[in-house]
Amino acid sequence: VTLTGDDQLGHANLNLNGATVTATAGIILDDAGTGLATVNFTGTAAQTVNGTINATSTTDEGTVNVLASANVVTFANNIGATATNILAVNIGNATLAGNAVFSGNVEAATITLGHESSVASAAYSADFNGNVVGDVVMDTGNAITETATATFAGNVTGDITLDDNVAAIDATATFDGTTAQTVLGTVAATTDTDGALRVTNTAGVTFQGVVGSSSTGIGSLGIASDS
């Protein structure tokens, strides 16, 4: 499946809501000028996606949206790669929650979980079982019961930003791998006391960048015994 946006013809959008989506040769996203290529996963029940999703070049092309509300979308293969980096992966938006499991690696310029303008009492989640390359933003909306939780089992190359839009600590990043992990990038709070950082990996996690700052400290830091 190839989606190609075009300056003259406009955007290319594909909505997929079947229980099983199989793209034997993968899904290719091609942004051309102002024409954007976007694939939306909108499963009405739990959804499994078989096949890679890539851009046509290294210039950050294409958008992947997970908009299936409480239904979990599981991606069996890699999304993006060094030479075919995706522009954006969005899990949920302002009106629909998103919950995703990524079995392979994910490479995108930006990976966004949740939405700052959401007013729904929704739970946004992402389970990354491979390596992640790209900047990750975890953003809860204006409802106090809204949560954005991400678990990382592999290495992360990019910055992680935790943003609680209400007083509760609702944006939580957990590192739960079974082998040693490395985070190449910062872990930052948008405002002071935003977010929670958890380490449950008993093999250890090395953070090579700054975690929080004197003016915008992380709201909660938890390290499990033997981690």
Descriptions of predicted regions:
Residues 219:
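UBL (ubiquitin/ubiquitin-like) substrate-recognition surfaces
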Residues 133-136, 157-159:
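Short, solvent-exposed S/T- and G/P-enriched segments that are highly enriched in secreted/extracellular
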Residues 1-22, 28-48, 56-82, 90-105, ...:
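Extracellular beta-strand-rich, repetitive "passenger/adhesive" scaffolds
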